[in-house]
């Protein structure tokens, strides 16, 4: 196996055989740091943007500019089939960690290897144009995730039926009400199964009349994920779907162990 460190040269290592009862590694992080450069610190709008988008970070000066260290010395190994709770107060680094393992952020230092594709359920909007019709948006998302249209018809039927959009799926997304757009997005992102799912509890269906139906679908969706990373403040939700906990504080993992031990550690230190 060849590992390329950021800004460095390939490092060669001989992979050791795993015991027969140990599942393959899905994600492997060692000493990972994530720095996010700040181009100016003079405007109030940037300050507000930092608060919204960077969690668990420390602002410092480096190389003539400002840098937010969002994650610091993060090390953990997640194996296929692990169901991991990300625990910590707002701003501890949970969402930033999800963005990093999903490929949205690139680490600055340390080693990070993803051996399975990670599907992020973090953003509340499509990475696409609102000029597209609902049908075109569904197809664009499917192509982005799968790289082809094999199995698309069944996927599309499921999305249209569950969202309840009917013929409105042929209209541009920009003509949808907020509730219609939220139902379409939720239906698309919870259709199918994924090898590894990274989910922030803050992701929601956005329509009160749709809530119960969405809750049932979400629980089924989480249950079918092969490997799960779930950031949440709900102990009952974490107990239902996870068996391991990572506790974050100030951009670092401060506890890694069985879920009940992790919850106990977090509540004890948070009091």
What is the role of each PLM region?
Residues 2-69, 266-268:
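Pre-NBD coupling/linker segments of ABC/ABC-like ATPases
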Residues 67, 74, 82-83:
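Conserved N-terminal flank of the Walker A/P-loop in ABC nucleotide-binding domains
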Residues 211-224:
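Helical segment within the ABC ATPase nucleotide-binding domain
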Residues 64-67, 117, 122-184, 188-196, ...:
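ABC-family P-loop ATPase nucleotide-binding domains
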Residues 232-233:
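H-loop/switch region of ABC-family ATPase nucleotide-binding domains
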Residues 252-271:
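Conserved beta-strand-loop-alpha-helix hinge in the C-terminal portion
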Residues 240-247:
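Conserved catalytic segment of ABC-fold P-loop ATPases
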Residues 28, 33-37, 80-85, 89-145:
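ABC ATPase nucleotide-binding domain signature region
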């Amino acid at each position: 196996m060849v590992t390329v460190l950021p800004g460095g040269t390939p490092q060669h290592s001989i992979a050791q055989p795993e015991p027969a009862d140990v599942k393959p590694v899905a994600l492997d992080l060692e000493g990972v740091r994530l720095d996010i450069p700040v181009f100016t610190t003079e405007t109030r709008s940037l300050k507000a943007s930092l608060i919204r988008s960077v969690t668990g970070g420390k602002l410092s000066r480096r190389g003539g500019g400002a840098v937010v260290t969002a994650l610091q010395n993060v090390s953990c190994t997640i194996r296929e089939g692990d169901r991991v709770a990300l625990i910590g107060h707002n701003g501890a680094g949970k969402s930033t960690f999800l963005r990093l393992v999903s490929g949205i952020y690139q680490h600055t230092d340390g080693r990070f290897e993803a051996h399975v594709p990670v599907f992020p359920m973090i953003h509340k909007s499509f990475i696409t144009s609102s000029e597209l019709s609902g049908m075109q948006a569904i197809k664009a998302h499917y192509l982005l995730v799968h790289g082809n249209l094999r199995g698309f018809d069944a996927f599309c039927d499921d999305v249209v039926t569950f969202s309840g959009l009917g013929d409105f799926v042929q209209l541009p997304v920009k003509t949808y009400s907020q509730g219609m757009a939220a139902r379409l997005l939720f239906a698309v992102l919870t259709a199918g199964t994924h090898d590894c799912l990274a989910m922030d509890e803050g992701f929601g269906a956005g329509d009160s009349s749709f809530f119960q139906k969405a809750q049932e679908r979400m629980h089924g969706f989480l249950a079918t994920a092969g490997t799960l990373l779930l950031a949440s403040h709900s102990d009952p939700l974490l107990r239902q779907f996870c068996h391991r906990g990572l506790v974050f504080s100030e951009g670092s993992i401060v506890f890694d162990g069985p879920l009940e031990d992790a919850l106990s550690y977090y509540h004890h230190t948070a009091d």
